[in-house]
UniProtKB/Swiss-Prot annotation:
Protein name per Swiss-Prot or TrEMBL: Melanocortin receptor 4
Extracellular side: 1-43, 107-123, 187-191, 272-280
Residue ranges of the TM segments: 44-69, 82-106, 124-145, 166-186, 192-215, 249-271, 281-304
GO molecular function per UniProt: melanocyte-stimulating hormone receptor activity; neuropeptide binding; ubiquitin protein ligase binding
Species this protein is from: Sus scrofa (Pig)
Protein localization: Cell membrane
Cystine residue pairs: C40-C279, C271-C277
Record's bilayer topology term: Multi-pass membrane protein
Glycosylation sites: N2, N17, N26
Recorded name of the encoding gene: MC4R
Lipidated residue numbers (S-palmitoyl cysteine): C318
Main location, first listed in the record: membrane
Length: 332
């Protein structure tokens, strides 16, 4: 992270900071006509309280998801274990962004001697954010593969996706993503790191898209074939497709919330001096808000799509001071 910071500017990741602050370091250069000093080149300011508030909301929501999956044995299935991994990643991304707001505020208000320590703390947070981003993508891909197996390898599914194997997969995901996140921050001065991250993002999306095209095309054929059979197969197939649709919604929200940020990185690499690119990059803080909103929206999707999860949420909430409210609602 750069040692010079623009007041009030919130950033994420070491090289993301460089891309944002780069807008100001070259502010004296003519980047285009018709742009005033207070115009599109100024970073959109978002109050630090907004980041902290979103971080707290995400923390509470995703902890609720993790506790619910751990508490309810009916949710001890590969898909929900991968959802739990995704919830951890979402929580870390959002909480780290909120924490980095505090760190940057301290960095702007402390003396030079204390800044080096604050920068080191900020780099650690950046590593957590980067690792969590990669873990989010890998968890989504794992859920996609799991749904693929449930639909096309239903008879062998329980032999393929054992609890032990799922645990190994999740452990490997976090180990690889943690190492990659640390390396990305260490070598963040190189543009190749940004290109690598962009490539990973679009490669994973392409893999998930290819799985889904095949999944939904073949699933339609399977549904037609089993339509003449007794209802159990149809019910099971319908449940599997519901899980696939849930993941489709999760991926859609992920793309919508993260795409502006990755477009920001692409513009930083390809056209850092173009007036239109600079104008887009000046809204960097808004893209961070979208990323944090993704971490808040995901638990709502889980709850809306899973009756079992909603039931467990209610049981957990009723164990605490809201128990009286839950008892009242259950009577009506």
């Amino acid at each position: 992270m750069n040692s010079t910071h623009h007041h009030g500017m919130h950033t994420s990741l070491h090289f993301w900071n460089r891309s944002t602050y780069g807008l100001h370091s070259n502010a004296s250069e003519p980047l285009g006509k018709g742009y005033s000093e207070g115009g599109c080149y100024e970073q959109l300011f978002v109050s630090p309280e907004v980041f902290v508030t979103l971080g707290v909301i995400s923390l509470l929501e995703n902890i609720l998801v993790i506790v619910a999956i751990a508490k309810n044995k009916n949710l001890h299935s590969p898909m929900y274990f991968f959802i739990c991994s995704l919830a951890v990643a979402d929580m870390l991304v959002s909480v780290s962004n909120g924490s980095e707001t505090i760190v940057i505020t301290l960095l702007n208000s402390t003396d030079t001697d204390a800044q080096s320590f604050t920068v080191n703390i900020d780099n650690v947070i950046d590593s957590v954010i980067c690792s969590s981003l990669l873990a989010s993508i890998c968890s989504l891909l794992s859920i996609a593969v799991d749904r693929y197996f449930t639909i096309f390898y239903a008879l062998q599914y329980h032999n393929i996706m054992t609890v032990k194997r799922v645990g190994i997969i999740i452990s490997c995901i976090w180990a690889v993503c943690t190492v990659s996140g640390v390396l990305f921050i260490i070598y963040s001065d190189s543009s190749a790191v940004i290109i690598c991250l962009i490539t990973v993002f679009f490669t994973m999306l392409a893999l998930m898209a290819s799985l889904y095209v095949h999944m939904f095309l073949m699933a339609r054929l399977h549904i037609k074939r089993i339509a003449v059979l007794p209802g159990t197969g149809t019910i099971r197939q319908g449940a599997n497709m519901k899980g696939a649709i849930t993941l489709t919604i999760l991926i859609g929200v992920f793309v919508v919330c993260w795409a502006p940020f990755f477009l920001h990185l692409i513009f930083y690499i390809s056209c850092p001096q173009n007036p239109y690119c600079v104008c887009f990059m000046s809204h960097f803080n808004l893209y961070l808000i979208l990323i944090m909103c993704n971490s808040i929206i995901d638990p709502l999707i889980y709850a809306l799509r899973s009756q079992e999860l909603r039931k467990t949420f209610k049981e957990i909430i009723c164990c605490y001071p809201l128990g009286g409210l839950c008892d009242l609602s259950s009577r009506y």
